[in-house]
Each structure stands twice: as structure tokens, then as C-alpha cells.
């Protein structure tokens, strides 16, 4: 009887033990629900921020966000995959996010700008990005770490859940675009490196052959390359603020509808200053404008307020180096953060004009114009309006329209020097001005600001003086004369 009772008690104890373990197992599963939900939410927000920060997915679909979330959770399942794969990719995306949110996905143009940017330009570029973009960038690695630490602490292993694996498999099979920003960055970087190598190889090449200049009226041909000047912010093009007194009153020809070849200096000028392949939208450095002019026996000069990292480090510096004489205000390229004024080019320009020379000359003046940040461009020039009389929202706009007026003043001074040279040395001239590209116009509740545009169809300011070069402009919409007698 005692033996039977002992067996019954033993059986009850075993059943009770199993029952207690079952309750303990269920309690453990319940305790993991909230941490798992927290990890999923963190991963989802991180995935969403990564997608919009890439610049390629401004409004990502729910499926795409789920795909990003699952990718993050899977890569977080292993310590090695987290630290050696997910974390580096996360930091790379976070680094690019401020740029991607405001200027679009990685491309040749932005990678080229990175190669050609000095410290001052980098500072000004970063300052024009809204604080909210930096907050999103900082949030990405924080969210990634939160979901990882939560999963580790509570022993959450998503890869063991069959439903999770099935959903992940279906989503991955459907679409896998997350690697596109990275692939585009690598592709653009390799393209830049390849282009630099080609620039070095063809630096001395010239496929124009011998050229002749017939029926030329002028002794000196001057081109002023502007910077970041939107057409619709010039009074000469109808803007109500009178910020172009010289352009609006000088005798010349105004081109309306000329479009920039790219969204930044390098992307634009490498096409505008060569004879490009219009089908592939690629430059032909062996057929450059400088080489064409030199082939006609004209002496060439390039005076620049832009930095020169190295003779062949960027397409623009390579094109400039083809000139017979070059002068750069910024010595040392990327390591020079001095904010030079465009007016600092004028003494060198006067020196070039005073030099005794036989034959014709071609002179390029590459100015900083209205390059962001525009307020830094006018440290030596008065603003059109007093800031205290304006709503703070229009503070940067005041700087921008004032920088255009400064460029107009620069053009007047160049013109006056050329006129003086006519009287002194009897050398006639042709003067041309155009901006390399425009800027996009954005605004929020607090301010109106400008940034690099995402498309290549950016209208730039074009003004031609005393020449018939408009015959070369195949995509101009309208040509009209200004103040002709």
C-alpha cells in the first residue's frame, strides 16, 4: 500500500514538474514578446531611415521597409555578421544620409564633387543641410544598436522562427534593391578613378589638328565662368529686385533657355568645355575647348578662384592645366580653406592684360559666384537689404541675391578693365559670361534656402557680349539683344 502511494506521489510530482516547466516556458515566451516587438520596431525605423537616406527611395513601400527590417534582424542574429557586415553598412548609410535626403542618390556628379572639394566647400556644403537630416543620420546606428542589444539580452532569435524565415524568403525573392546605393557609390567611384587615369594619359593629347581663325574681329576673348547662379534670381531675367545693373544696361546679347550640362561644377564643365558625346552624355577630353583655341595659335590663360587639388585630380583642373598659363588663388587644393573673394582675381587679370603680347588671347576667369554658402561670398560686399529690416526667413535669400549683384559688379569691373585696355593698347575684345549650373529652391517654416539640384535640366544664367558665339548654342530657347544701338 505504501509502495503504491509512493508511486502515485511520484507520478503526481512528475506531472506537477512538467506542468510547472510548461508554465515556465510559456512565461518565458510571453516575456520575450515585448522585447521582440521593440527590436522589430527599432529595425523597421532604422530600415526606413536607411532607405530614404539613400536618396533612391523617397517614399519606400511597405514591402521594401519590411525587407529592410528583415535584413537588419537577420544580420543581427550573429555577433560576427552584426559587427563585420551590418554595422559597417549602417555607418556607411548614416554617413551618406544627410546628403541623400537633400541631394539624391550617389552618382557620378556627387562622387566627382567629393574628389574636387576643399575644406571650405565641405564646411559650406554641410552647413546648408537641415539639422533634421543629421538627426535622422544619427538615429540610424542608435536604432540598430538598440534592436541588437535587446535581442541579445532577451535571447530573441528571429532566425529560428519558421514564419519569419518564410516571410524573409518571399521578400528577398521578390525584390533586393537595398544594395543599390552601395553599388552606385562603388560604380561612381571606380568611374572617377578610371576617368582620372584617362585624364593623365591624354593630358597632352589634342585631336583637333591644326585650326584657323577666319574673320576674327577681336584681339582678346574673355569667358567668365560663374557659379550656382539661378536665372530667375537675376533682374536681367525679370527678377523684381534690381541686382544686375550691369547686365541689365550693358550692350550685348542675352541667351534665355540655355541649360546646364550637370548639377555641379565638375559634372557640368567637363561637358560644356569639351565636345561631348551627346548620346552617352560623356566628355571627350581629347577635344577640349582650350585645345581647340590653342590649335588656332591663340594664347590661353586660366585664372581661378576655385581650388586645385592636383593637375589631373579633377576634370576641371585637367582642362585648366591645358592652358598656356594658369593661376589659382587657392594653393594646395583641399588643404586650403581660405575664403577668397572673386575680386581678388582682378589684379591678376589686369596683369595679364598689361602683358605685351603678339596675336590673340583667350582668358578664362573661373569665379566662386553664388556658391553655397552665399553669405560667405559677400563678406566684402554689402547686402542689398539690411537683415534687421527683414523677416529672418529671408536672411539667406538676401545673401543669395546680393551675391548675384556682386557677380554683376565683378563683370562690370572686368568689362571696365577691358575697355581701359582698348584705350591703352588698342586691343578689342569679346566678353562672355555664364554660370556652370543653377540651384534648387527649397523652403520650410523657418527659412528659404538653396541646394544642389537632383536633375540635370538646371537653367543657368547666360550672357553674351560683343560676339556671335550664340550660333554654337544648340539648346537655347530664346536669344535677344540688350541695349543694342
From Swiss-Prot:
EC number: 2.7.-.-
Primary site of residence: membrane
CDD domains: LptA
Entry membrane topology: Multi-pass membrane protein
GO cellular component annotations of the record: plasma membrane
UniProt keyword list: Cell membrane, Membrane, Transferase, Transmembrane, Transmembrane helix
Molecular-function GO term, any one: phosphotransferase activity, phosphate group as acceptor
Name the UniProt record assigns to this protein: Putative phosphoethanolamine transferase HI_1064
Amino acid at each position: 500500500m505504501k509502495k503504491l502511494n509512493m508511486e502515485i506521489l511520484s507520478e503526481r510530482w512528475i506531472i506537477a514538474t512538467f506542468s510547472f516547466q510548461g508554465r515556465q516556458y510559456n512565461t518565458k515566451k510571453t516575456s520575450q514578446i515585448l522585447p521582440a516587438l521593440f527590436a522589430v520596431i527599432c529595425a523597421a525605423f532604422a530600415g526606413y531611415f536607411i532607405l530614404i537616406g539613400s536618396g533612391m527611395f523617397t517614399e519606400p513601400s511597405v514591402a521594401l521597409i519590411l525587407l529592410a527590417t528583415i535584413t537588419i534582424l537577420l544580420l543581427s542574429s550573429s555577433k560576427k555578421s552584426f559587427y563585420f557586415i551590418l554595422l559597417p553598412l549602417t555607418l556607411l548609410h548614416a554617413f551618406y544620409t544627410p546628403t541623400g535626403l537633400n541631394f539624391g542618390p550617389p552618382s557620378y556628379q556627387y562622387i566627382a564633387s567629393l574628389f574636387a572639394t576643399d575644406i571650405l566647400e565641405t564646411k559650406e556644403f554641410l552647413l546648408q543641410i537641415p539639422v533634421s537630416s543629421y538627426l535622422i543620420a544619427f538615429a540610424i546606428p542608435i536604432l540598430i544598436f538598440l534592436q541588437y542589444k535587446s535581442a541579445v539580452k532577451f535571447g530573441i532569435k528571429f532566425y529560428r522562427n519558421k514564419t519569419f524565415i518564410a516571410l524573409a524568403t518571399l521578400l528577398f525573392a521578390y525584390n533586393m534593391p537595398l544594395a543599390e546605393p552601395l553599388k552606385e557609390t562603388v560604380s561612381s567611384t571606380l568611374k572617377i578613378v578610371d576617368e582620372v587615369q584617362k585624364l593623365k594619359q591624354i593630358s597632352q593629347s589634342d585631336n583637333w589638328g591644326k585650326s584657323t581663325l577666319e574673320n576674327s574681329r577681336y584681339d582678346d576673348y574673355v569667358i567668365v565662368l560663374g557659379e550656382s547662379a539661378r536665372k530667375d534670381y537675376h533682374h536681367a531675367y525679370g527678377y523684381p529686385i534690381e541686382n544686375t545693373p550691369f547686365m541689365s544696361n550693358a550692350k550685348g546679347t542675352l541667351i534665355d533657355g540655355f541649360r546646364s550640362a550637370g548639377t555641379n561644377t565638375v559634372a557640368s564643365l567637363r561637358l560644356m568645355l569639351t565636345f561631348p558625346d551627346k548620346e552617352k552624355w560623356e566628355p571627350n577630353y581629347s577635344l577640349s575647348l582650350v585645345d581647340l583655341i590653342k590649335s588656332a595659335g591663340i594664347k590661353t590663360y586660366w585664372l581661378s578662384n576655385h581650388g586645385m587639388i592636383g593637375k589631373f585630380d579633377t576634370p576641371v583642373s585637367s582642362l585648366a592645366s591645358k592652358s598656356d598659363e594658369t593661376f589659382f588663388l587657392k594653393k594646395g587644393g583641399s588643404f586650403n580653406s581660405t575664403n577668397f573673394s572673386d575680386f581678388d582675381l582682378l589684379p591678376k587679370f589686369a596683369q595679364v592684360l598689361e602683358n605685351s603680347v603678339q596675336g590673340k588671347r583667350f582668358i578664362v576667369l573661373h569665379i566662386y559666384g553664388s556658391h553655397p554658402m552665399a553669405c560667405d561670398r559677400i563678406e566684402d560686399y554689402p547686402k542689398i537689404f539690411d537683415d534687421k529690416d527683414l523677416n529672418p526667413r529671408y536672411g539667406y535669400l538676401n545673401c543669395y541675391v546680393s551675391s548675384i549683384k556682386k557677380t554683376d559688379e565683378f563683370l562690370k569691373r572686368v568689362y571696365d578693365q577691358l575697355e581701359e585696355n582698348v584705350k591703352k593698347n588698342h586691343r578689342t575684345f569679346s566678353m562672355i559670361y555664364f554660370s556652370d549650373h543653377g540651384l534648387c529652391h527649397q523652403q520650410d517654416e523657418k527659412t528659404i534656402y538653396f541646394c544642389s539640384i537632383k536633375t540635370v535640366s538646371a537653367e543657368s544664367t547666360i550672357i553674351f557680349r560683343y560676339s556671335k558665339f550664340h550660333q554654337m548654342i544648340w539648346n537655347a530657347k530664346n536669344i535677344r539683344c540688350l541695349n543694342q544701338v
